[in-house]
């Protein structure tokens, strides 16, 4: 008699692997408080990278478990996997993180089978989880009522958020926060006896900051609320700001930021809480912001297929200068660009395909300091041919035939990245007012400086490789030439040996593969002389090799810079 097919055993092993992953994820996350209290800034960066890498490492480990435990002809019998899915559904029903467990299952399935075997019968293309469930669980938020004064309300808040490192000047902090709150809200709101504060119980940690996150509300309105805390070494914990502007809070949870570390026992509930105070954010971005980037990827994919099914939108080439390495297309009604690697690069590019892939993957694991767009990597996307404008499809097939192929009425995209769509900076400047040009060039220089201080050198700093977000921030998004700043050799141009040297079309000095001459930046970056002069006035130090060498020295000494995800006026 043949043995029954081991669907339940396979499902249990997949879930055991998920438990192991979540345990390691939680261990790294729970260490965030101590790292903050002890000002272990470099450990924070290492922990963030380790937590990002953890998912793929654990998927590979569980893949190995399965292959060792079950014969290939059993494990890889895809016709039986609906039984595994059904068994898995029953196993995860009691969980508080079941949507993450579904995504984990999908990752294991894709690690075992080719993508052309993907179906909703075998996988969770559509979630089986209800978006909100009424369950008995510990409260994830605390509520504070106006008790006589704003100062008393704030004092009650901070009494519930102690640290092993004491607050340096709590009464001074409370006075400043009360003043900022009165500036942010109308006077009648501050005096409204119905005014209350609701805060998420766990503190959110990222880089050098800790964040209290929640909302202010009365019987009629609500406002998001974020209170960033800093550890001033030698001075204790300090409340750095109070932020109630939705756009400012949205930037804190931006796709350009590193992921928060927060103890989130019920991820869906926390994401729904954030969604209520930031209705403009997609849940994919909110999941990603707290470190569940694979769940963010799942939610993004579901939103994409729903958009394609419910609209007449068709893929078109993205506006802007065509890339020398990547080809970029988009859906006009979907705020995302899709990037594929061309088969042949422009002659001026010295990178190869493998290097480009490594560069894009690097971006996910480094501190993006609010200046680099996060990416999601996909394999074997399949779309109906009818969803492409003919000229877009023709261009993709021409420049990347090894990546884009036709399978009857289906377009197969073997490999791509997605990024948030932005307005290319060069196009933005063409339409900008004088004031907007000033703000954009100021922020462009700040973006370069902040990336550099985080040990990232963009390489190709042309305006077309930066975008402007809906909040007016300048963000870098073309990664094929990025490197660590400490790998670059910044040099002054040597003086000419003879008068004829300056007239020559060739340099009179040797140039190594990692050499960069900042004095050459002005004509390289700006054809417009007015913009060139303005940028020189705003950020002229970027043209000096000594400025870059000073940053390199600070990085080598182990200094970790402060880059705040909120504007100066909020502090």
Curated annotation (Swiss-Prot):
One of its GO terms (molecular function) is AMP binding. The gene is aceK. Coiled coil: none annotated. It is found in: Cytoplasm. It catalyses: L-seryl-[isocitrate dehydrogenase] + ATP = O-phospho-L-seryl-[isocitrate dehydrogenase] + ADP + H(+). Belongs to the AceK family. GO terms for cellular component: cytoplasm. Bifunctional enzyme which can phosphorylate or dephosphorylate isocitrate dehydrogenase (IDH) on a specific serine residue. This is a regulatory mechanism which enables bacteria to bypass the Krebs cycle via the glyoxylate shunt in response to the source of carbon. When bacteria are grown on glucose, IDH is fully active and unphosphorylated, but when grown on acetate or ethanol, the activity of IDH declines drastically concomitant with its phosphorylation. Its EC number is 2.7.11.5, 3.1.3.-. Pfam families: AceK_kinase, AceK_regulatory. The keyword Protein transport does not apply. The active site is at 374. This is Isocitrate dehydrogenase kinase/phosphatase. ATP binds at residues 318-324, 339. GO terms for biological process: glucose metabolic process; glyoxylate cycle; tricarboxylic acid cycle. PANTHER family: ISOCITRATE DEHYDROGENASE KINASE_PHOSPHATASE, PTHR39559. It comes from the Bacteria. Keywords: ATP-binding, Cytoplasm, Glyoxylate bypass, Hydrolase, Kinase, Nucleotide-binding, Protein phosphatase, Serine/threonine-protein kinase, Transferase, Tricarboxylic acid cycle.
């Amino acid at each position: 008699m043949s043995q029954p097919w081991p669907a339940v055993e396979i499902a249990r092993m997949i879930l055991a692997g998920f438990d192991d992953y979540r345990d390691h994820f939680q261990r790294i996350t729970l260490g965030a408080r101590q790292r903050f209290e002890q000002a272990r800034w470099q450990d924070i960066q290492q922990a963030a990278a380790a937590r990002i890498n953890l998912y793929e490492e654990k998927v590979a480990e569980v893949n190995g478990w399965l292959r060792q435990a079950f014969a290939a002809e059993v494990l890889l019998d895809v016709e039986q996997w609906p039984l595994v899915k059904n068994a898995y559904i029953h196993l995860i029903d009691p969980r508080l993180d079941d949507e993450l467990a579904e995504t984990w299952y999908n990752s294991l399935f894709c690690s075992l089978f080719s993508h052309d075997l993907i179906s909703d019968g075998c996988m969770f293309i559509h979630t089986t989880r209800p978006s909100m469930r009424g369950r008995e669980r510990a409260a994830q938020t605390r509520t504070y009522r106006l008790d006589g004064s704003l100062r008393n309300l704030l004092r009650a808040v901070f009494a519930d958020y102690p640290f092993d490192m004491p607050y340096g000047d709590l009464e001074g902090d409370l006075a400043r926060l009360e003043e900022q709150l009165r500036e942010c809200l109308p006077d009648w709101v501050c005096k409204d006896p119905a005014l209350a504060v609701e805060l998420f119980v766990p503190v959110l940690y990222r880089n050098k900051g800790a964040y209290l996150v929640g909302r202010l509300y009365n019987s009629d309105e609500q406002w998001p609320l974020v209170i960033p805390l800093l550890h001033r070494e030698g001075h204790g914990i300090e409340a750095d700001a109070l932020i109630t502007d939705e756009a400012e809070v949205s930037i804190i949870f931006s796709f350009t930021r590193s992921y928060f570390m927060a103890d989130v026992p019920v991820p869906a509930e926390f994401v729904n809480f954030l969604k209520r105070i930031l209705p403009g954010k997609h849940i994919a971005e909110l999941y990603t912001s707290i470190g569940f980037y694979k769940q963010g990827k799942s939610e993004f994919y579901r939103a994409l297929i729903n958009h394609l099914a419910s609209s007449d939108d068709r893929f078109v080439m993205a506006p802007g200068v065509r890339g020398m390495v990547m080809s970029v297309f988009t859906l006009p009604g979907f705020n995302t660009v899709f990037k594929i690697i061309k088969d042949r690069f422009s002659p001026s590019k010295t990178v190869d395909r493998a290097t480009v892939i490594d560069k894009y993957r690097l971006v996910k694991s480094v501190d993006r300091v609010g200046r680099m767009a996060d990416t999601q990597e996909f394999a074997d996307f399949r779309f109906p041919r009818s969803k492409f404008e003919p000229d877009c499809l023709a261009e993709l097939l021409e420049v990347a035939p090894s990546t884009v192929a036709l399978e009857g009425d289906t377009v197969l995209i073997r490999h791509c990245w997605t990024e948030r769509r932005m307005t290319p900076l060069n196009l933005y400047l063409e339409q900008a007012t004088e004031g907007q040009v000033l703000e954009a060039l100021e922020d462009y220089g700040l973006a370069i400086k902040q990336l550099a201080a985080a040990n990232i050198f963009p390489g190709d700093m042309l305006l077309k490789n930066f975008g402007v977000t809906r909040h007016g921030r300048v963000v870098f998004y073309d990664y094929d030439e990025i490197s660590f700043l400490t790998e670059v050799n910044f040099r002054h141009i040597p003086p000419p040996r003879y008068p004829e040297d300056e007239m020559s079309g060739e340099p009179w000095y040797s140039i190594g593969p990692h050499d960069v001459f900042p004095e050459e930046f002005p004509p390289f970056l700006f054809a417009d002389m007015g913009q060139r002069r303005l940028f020189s006035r705003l950020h002229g130090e970027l043209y000096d090799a000594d400025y870059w060498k000073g940053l390199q020295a600070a990085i080598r000494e182990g200094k970790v810079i402060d880059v705040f995800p909120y504007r100066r006026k909020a502090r």
